[in-house]
């Protein structure tokens, strides 16, 4: 697991580097599906003092199998998403400013331009709010459940992120680094949408044919963006 712990450590260290976290407000995980184990950031440990060996390994029930610290308080959310969506290899949660602002407003991040469409096939959805019972019960598990309720059976890698109402963004990808990449993009397009709607409050969504072109040329069966 050392290689995966190193990857998760590096991905977590990317969060402050890209300006996605303040203090300890974020976490990254990755899964080894063959072993049924997840590596995740320890809870409340400052980034500047964190080391690769501080990463915590848990099984799919959340039991710690390796590590001296408690895992992230959001571990149950990560595990619920891994259980539901086999294509996920890494998950990120942050409180990045602009994506969190959309979450607090209770609004999806609208697809307004090609930057958004290069990564997200449509709006980045916002979940419903959790009930008092859901919050007082298994809060983190229920956060995962409300994300799944919102995504349904859609391919999560076509919409690699979501904002949880009154909470903040979660993003995911093929692995931990891909998940962080998508979290960075989500924050940028959230900022762009806020600025664009401020300039033109009547601004419409990106034309569907343009969105389809930009998403499919990067992610479709005949994708041609980048190098083989």
Curated annotation (Swiss-Prot):
Residues binding Zn(2+), per UniProt: 74, 93, 95, 167
UniProt KW keywords: Carbohydrate metabolism, Isomerase, Metal-binding, Zinc
Cofactors: Zn(2+)
UniProt record similarity statement: Belongs to the aldolase class II family. AraD/FucA subfamily.
Inducing factors: Induced by L-ascorbate. Repressed by UlaR.
Organism per entry: Escherichia fergusonii (strain ATCC 35469 / DSM 13698 / CCUG 18766 / IAM 14443 / JCM 21226 / LMG 7866 / NBRC 102419 / NCTC 12128 / CDC 0568-73)
GO CC annotation terms, alphabetical: cytosol
Binding site for substrate: 26-27, 43-44, 72-73
GO BP terms in the entry: L-ascorbic acid catabolic process; pentose catabolic process
Protein name: L-ribulose-5-phosphate 4-epimerase UlaF
HAMAP family in the record: UlaF
Molecular function per GO: aldehyde-lyase activity; L-ribulose-phosphate 4-epimerase activity; zinc ion binding
Cofactor note: Binds 1 zinc ion per subunit.
PANTHER family in UniProt: FUCULOSE PHOSPHATE ALDOLASE, L-RIBULOSE-5-PHOSPHATE 4-EPIMERASE ULAF
Pfam families membership: Aldolase_II (PF00596)
Reactions this protein catalyses: L-ribulose 5-phosphate = D-xylulose 5-phosphate
Function according to Swiss-Prot or TrEMBL: Catalyzes the isomerization of L-ribulose 5-phosphate to D-xylulose 5-phosphate. Is involved in the anaerobic L-ascorbate utilization.
Gene: ulaF
Catalytic center residues: 118, 225
UniProt EC number: 5.1.3.4
Associated pathway: Cofactor degradation; L-ascorbate degradation; D-xylulose 5-phosphate from L-ascorbate: step 4/4
